[in-house]
Amino acid sequence: GAQANQKYALVIGGNAIVVSAEIREGISTAWNLHEMGYPVFVLRYRIGMKASNNAPLQDVVRAVQYITEHAGQFGVQVEDYAIVSYSSGGQIAGLFGTDAVGYKNYGLPKPGAMLLGYPVNTFLEFKPVYNILLDPGVCKQRYYKMTLSDYITPDYPPTYHWYGKNDMTLMTMCWSAQ
């Protein structure tokens, strides 16, 4: 049976604006972690036209809040959890791990580990398009306007980051900025 008070993982797949990778990246990763004995949760966050007003980042916050509030029911620790994320999901997870806009701002425990698979560091050339489509007329800070590496501090959670040298998607998104 399941043990109580285990470390858990929250898995966040990427997306291609209107298509989610929650099955390919999220569920498949979750299954492998589950097979290794880890309690695991997969986040389905808002994408496409539903991603305005920092919705994807807020979805990460709400997921960690929910898991934290129900830790006893799930048999998990509230501290030292891991976030495993991919692509654009890696960008919002990465921002959640920061002091500036992440967990601290919501009174949540700091992630114990960040596993960022080919995360988007910046939406550079897409920023104006995202702003027009998602938040027209809004000049406030939005996740898609943030360059993740600008928010990394010495207190950032321990991180394992990987990407493929021949990743054509990141190459089309201004490779040198990723």
Listing of model-derived features with the role each one plays in the protein:
Residues P136-Y151, Y156-P157:
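Active-site nucleophile elbow and catalytic-triad environment of alpha/beta-hydrolase enzymes
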Residues Y160-G164:
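Short beta-strand/loop motif that positions the catalytic acidic residue
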Residues Y8, H34-R44, A82, A113:
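A fold-wide structural signal in alpha/beta-hydrolase
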Residues M168-W175:
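Conserved alpha/beta-hydrolase "acid-adjacent" motif
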Residues G13-V18, K165:
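Active-site glycine-rich loops that stabilize anionic/oxyanionic intermediates
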Residues A21-G26, F41-V78:
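Catalytic nucleophile-loop/oxyanion-hole region of alpha/beta-hydrolase
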Residues R62-I132, K140-Y143:
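Primarily recognizes the serine-hydrolase "nucleophile elbow" in alpha/beta-hydrolase
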Residues N5-N15:
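Short beta-strand element of the alpha/beta-hydrolase
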